[in-house]
């Protein structure tokens, strides 16, 4: 049975609002609006470089910023900003109905909160397995440890990290442009294909031998 590995944030759900809201809380009174913030982030600029390049009134050291970020980014208050992309539920439902096994792999910290969010979205029965690195290991190491599912036709994600993971494991890598990296940034990691949104996965070469209709 063919299977697909999906990333979560930026791939199946819109989580940009959550990240920008937390950034604005921790680094107040900057010249950055959401568009400018994501322009920098999608170009691959990390928080340390970004914070050092702008005016703000935060007294946090970068190490303190990182600690607070990890403490709050998956709090219920901020997770409530997340919403599924309008096309994600129908895609997952259709793939499942075609006997394609769906796996979710995310670098989040708390498996129980991932499970709760999937239940909120009505997605808890779509995935054969949900894997959470808990920030304790890389996605690559997690997949090696548990074993890559049989007949994986693609791994889809919104970051260079996802593409690199797929490439190193010999999985067909698909980058998606709804998330945290721009097309120019994703191309640096040599994806097999780049798509505008996750529902376009059915039009990739990964599906050329799959009877999807």
How does the language model describe each region?
Residues 69, 108, 159:
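Short, flexible active-site-adjacent loop segments at beta-strand->alpha-helix junctions, enriched
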Residues 23, 88-118, 133:
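Substrate-recognition element of Asp-dependent hydrolases with the DxDx(T/V) motif
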Residues 1-2, 112-213:
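Asp-based, Mg2+/Mn2+-dependent phosphohydrolase catalytic module
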Residues 10, 37-38, 77-79, 101-104, ...:
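Short, contiguous strand/loop micro-motifs
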Residues 87-91, 142-145:
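Well-ordered alpha-helical segments embedded in enzymatic catalytic cores
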Residues 2-86, 90:
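N-terminal helical cap/lid subdomain that shapes the substrate entry/recognition surface
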């Amino acid at each position: 049975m063919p299977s697909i590995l999906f990333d979560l944030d930026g791939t199946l759900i819109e989580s940009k609002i959550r990240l920008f809201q937390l950034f604005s809380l921790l680094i107040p009174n900057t010249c950055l609006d959401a568009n400018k913030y994501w322009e920098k982030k999608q170009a691959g600029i990390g928080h340390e470089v970004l914070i050092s390049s702008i005016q703000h009134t935060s007294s946090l050291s970068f190490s303190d910023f990182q600690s607070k970020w990890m403490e709050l980014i998956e709090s219920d208050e901020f997770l409530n900003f997340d919403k599924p992309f309008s096309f994600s539920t129908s895609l997952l439902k259709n793939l499942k109905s075609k006997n394609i096994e769906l796996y979710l792999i995310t670098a989040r910290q708390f498996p129980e909160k991932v499970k709760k969010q999937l239940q909120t979205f009505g997605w808890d029965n779509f995935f054969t397995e949900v894997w959470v690195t808990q920030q304790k290991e890389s996605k690559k190491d997690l997949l090696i440890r548990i074993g890559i599912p049989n007949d994986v036709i693609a791994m889809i994600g919104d970051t260079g990290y996802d593409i690199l993971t797929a490439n190193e494991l010999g999985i067909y890598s698909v980058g998606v442009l709804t998330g945290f990296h721009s097309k120019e940034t994703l191309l640096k990691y040599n994806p097999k294909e780049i798509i505008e949104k996750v529902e376009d996965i059915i039009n990739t070469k990964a599906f050329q031998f799959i009877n999807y209709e």
